[in-house]
Amino acid sequence: MARITGNRVDAPAGAVPAYNDYGPGFYCTPYAELAREWACPQRGKDGIANRYELDLGGLGVLDLEAEGCSVLTWLAVLVSNRPVQVSSPIARDGMEYLRRVFGIDLEPYDVVRGYRADDSYFSFVRAFLNNTLSVAQVGRAMRLGGLGSQVMVRSELAFGRLCFRGYETVPACEYYPLRMCRDASARRAFQDERAAADLDGLYIRDILREEVGPDDPRIR
């Protein structure tokens, strides 16, 4: 796995601030190329990508990308950990419903894997809560936008398994443009989905009205 940072970090010392996608933890990605992009958020400023190895044997792993795991579960985890400003009753009620019905207690898990949702991608979440994207549209926008996967190490047991395997300097001249290209791709996917009418789609208003649950086949 690779960790993106401005400095070499031989031994992660603990959690990042609580308001991250899956709560406090050590965030990495299993994809080296993606880590290199994340390491270069500024034009002209090289980054550093640290490499780690993690033995998952015996660890409790929650995979939010696994087959059978609804996008609503991913959304519920996000809105349970990241502050979301909502301005309408339906968005407020929808957020609370997601937390209550589709939320997952992360305490039993040592590691969480799933899509990332930085600020540009969080538009998907807000649009869904505001009833302008359907469940299917959110799923398509996430896949087509190339969000990328992240792995969050959250327990002491998992931290003890992390082994530092080196680091590399990442040239911004190469990876900053790639990062911006991925960001633009996600924004296009979002705009394309928002412009399309999903007349038969399942929206947050429908979920609230029908009290849709995790076993409903329409959310698979």
Identify the role of each PLM range:
Residues 1-26, 34-36, 40-42:
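Glycine-rich loop/turn
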Residues 8, 20-21, 37, 41-47, ...:
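Conserved NAD+-utilizing ADP-ribose enzyme module
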